[in-house]
Every structure is written in C-alpha cells, then in structure tokens.
C-alpha cells in the first residue's frame, strides 16, 4: 500500500537508535527526505553511512537554547516524529530532582519545543502536516519503579490531545503511538530475564512483546494521508495490554 510519503520532508528525534532509527530508514525507503536528530554523534554518523541522504542534526533536546539554535534553520518539515525519550527508573520514595528534571525536559518539554518550531513552519507555509508522538502503555498503567516515566508519558498523551485541538484548524494532525515493551536491542537486554518478562507477558493477550516494525508501521500510517481523519488519538501497539 502506497502511503504517499514520497517527496515529503520528515524530522525524527531520537533517531540514533531503536524505534527512531528504524523510522528514519522506513521513511527514506518510502521516498521521504529525512532530518535525523540525536544527541549522539557516533549514532548519526553510523546512520548516514547506512542511509546516505539523511540530514543529521546533533543536539541534546534537554537543552532548550541549543535545540532552538540547532533547529531554527532546519527548513520546511511536513512530518514530525517525536521519539526521543529517557527512562530513569526509581522507586517512588527514591525519585530524585535530577530524574524529574531530565525526564520531563526530554519526554515532554522537548516535544513542546520541537513541535512548536515545526508547526509554526507549517502554518507559515500554509501547508497541512502530521505529527506523531511516541508515548507508551506506561501512560495509562502504573508500573513499579516507573513513577517519573509513567508521569511524563501520561502528560504526553494529554499534550497530544491539546496539540490536536489547537493545530487541527491549521490542518495539522497530531497522534500518539503507545507501545508495550519493544524488542529493540535495549528492550531485549532489559527484558532478557525470563521471570521479569513472564510477569509482563502474562498481561498481554497476544502473549508477546512488540517488534520494532510493529511500531514503525503504525507511525508511518499515522503520518500518511491514509489516516487523514485521525487526530488526537493514542493508538496502542501493545498486544492487548491496555484491554486487560
């Protein structure tokens, strides 16, 4: 199925690894031009070697001023994927100020800032656009030691709805994808303990974790005109976890 992404220009944050990297590769394969944002230069260099033509931008999205400078002249963007995130896991009684600041700065504040930059450009050009925020099932279910992470993703879901409300009149659609555990290299490492994995898998009706392509396919669908009447949604990619 042709998603009609050829010739469009996309920006993907957290593009160096995992879901972000795979999203960049899928967008390029679909004929889109892609700006890849990561804080890790080595990851960007490796991505460009694998996929020539990707436009790399190296910046720490937790730094508001640096992000403003790095993206102020990024050029026209039609599609945005806010994927960058951190997960700093601590028991509630041990949550630190540093974990709060870092998590909210990257997982929420940076989404606001990058989306403002991109949406203002869309509005100035008078063109429609699509934004996808990568959220999590943790936005809607409490998970042990995920106090700050769950809170940032819950806020991201509401931000998605607010953006959809206020950007809709400008023909900009905004949606979120909410995956379960995803089998990125980090996901495989973090959930390699069979006892830990079983506790989560027992809550997933399909009995398995998500593969990266499950999430990427959903992102591309939400970016495409095939989802032209969909905005303000938080779409689970969770094997039924949120249905239980």
Curated annotation (Swiss-Prot):
N-acetylmethionine modification, residue list: 1
Major localization listed first in the record, in broad terms: membrane
Membrane topology: Peripheral membrane protein
GO biological process annotation, one example: glucose metabolic process
Omega-N-methylarginine modification, residue list: 21
Reported tissue expression: Highly expressed in kidney, liver and epididymis. Expressed at intermediate level in lung. Weakly or not expressed in brain, heart, spleen and testis.
Residues reported in the UniProt entry to bind substrate: 136
Catalytic activity as recorded in UniProt: xylitol + NADP(+) = L-xylulose + NADPH + H(+)
EC top class named in words: oxidoreductase
Subcellular location: Membrane; Apical cell membrane
InterPro entries in the record: L-xylulose/Carbonyl_redctase (IPR051737), NAD(P)-bd_dom_sf (IPR036291), Sc_DH/Rdtase_CS (IPR020904), SDR_fam (IPR002347)
Superkingdom classification of source: Eukaryota
UniProt EC number: 1.1.1.10
Pfam families tied to this protein: adh_short_C2 (PF13561)
Catalytic residue positions: 149, 153
Binding of NADP(+), residues: 11-39
Entry's Gene Ontology cellular component terms: apical plasma membrane; brush border; cytoplasmic microtubule; cytosol; microvillus
Family note: Belongs to the short-chain dehydrogenases/reductases (SDR) family.
Subunit-level organization: Homotetramer.
Function: Catalyzes the NADPH-dependent reduction of several pentoses, tetroses, trioses, alpha-dicarbonyl compounds and L-xylulose. Participates in the uronate cycle of glucose metabolism. May play a role in the water absorption and cellular osmoregulation in the proximal renal tubules by producing xylitol, an osmolyte, thereby preventing osmolytic stress from occurring in the renal tubules.
Identification of the protein by name: L-xylulose reductase
Lineage: Eukaryota, Metazoa, Chordata, Craniata, Vertebrata
Recorded name of the encoding gene: Dcxr
């Amino acid at each position: 199925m042709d998603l009609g992404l050829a010739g469009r220009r996309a920006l993907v944050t957290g593009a160096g690894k995992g879901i972000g990297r795979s999203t960049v590769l899928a967008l390029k394969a679909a004929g889109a031009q892609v700006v890849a944002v990561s804080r890790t230069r080595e990851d960007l260099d490796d991505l460009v070697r694998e996929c020539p033509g990707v436009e790399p931008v190296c910046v720490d999205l937790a730094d508001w001023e640096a992000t403003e400078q790095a993206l102020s002249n990024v050029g026209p963007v039609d599609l945005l994927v806010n994927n960058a995130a951190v997960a700093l896991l601590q028991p509630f009684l041990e949550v630190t100020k540093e974990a709060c600041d870092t998590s909210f700065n990257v997982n929420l504040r940076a989404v606001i800032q990058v989306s403002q930059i991109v949406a203002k450009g869309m509005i100035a050009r008078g063109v429609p656009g699509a934004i996808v925020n990568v959220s999590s099932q943790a936005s809607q279910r409490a998970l042990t030691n995920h106090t700050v992470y769950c809170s940032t993703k819950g806020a991201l879901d509401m931000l998605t709805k607010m953006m959809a409300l206020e950007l809709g009149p400008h023909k900009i659609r905004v949606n979120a994808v909410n995956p379960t555990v995803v089998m990125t290299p980090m996901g495989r490492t973090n959930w390699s303990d069979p006892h830990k994995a079983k506790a989560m898998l027992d809550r997933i009706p399909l009995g398995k974790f998500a593969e990266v392509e499950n999430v990427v396919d959903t992102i591309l669908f939400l970016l495409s005109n095939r989802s032209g009447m969909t905005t303000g949604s938080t779409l689970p990619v969770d094997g039924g976890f949120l249905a239980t």
